[in-house]
């Protein structure tokens, strides 16, 4: 705070033009080598360089950014995009990056792992029905099929945490500008994927019941 006063950095509440910085999934699991889904790009250092540029951007624009909105991809083991959710006829789980299509579900190639039903508080028959509904809904959108991702961004893990350099820059901003960051948790619904911070990929189950909702607070 003393540093901010010395350098003429105002409180965010005094901004006449309010600027939000939305930082999408700047987490170890995606952004640092040797973590689960590191995005290296062609150079092998893509996400690392992105982190560096982002941190520099925060410090260079400290007095202009009103509030920072970091999104946090947040998962547990038993979710519709993880291997534990599925079994084949012999009880085996799919490997990472397996695609689960409508035909796979219809033909019994992959089905819901009924052992999870008590823990998830759902009926195994309903979960199987949901899996068919879900893959059909994805196919109807024409975007992609259901992918079984490696376990990543696991809640409470080091991989789930923000990249340390960015977290430090965000903390510095929050103190200097007296502006609390607004964390946007996504991806914690069991029965739907949630790539965008604005909302999940599928909003309802086969019975019409909601399985997720758009993030209206962030949208507005």
Which residue ranges define each predicted feature?
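Active-site-adjacent betaalpha module
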Residues: 1-69, 75-220
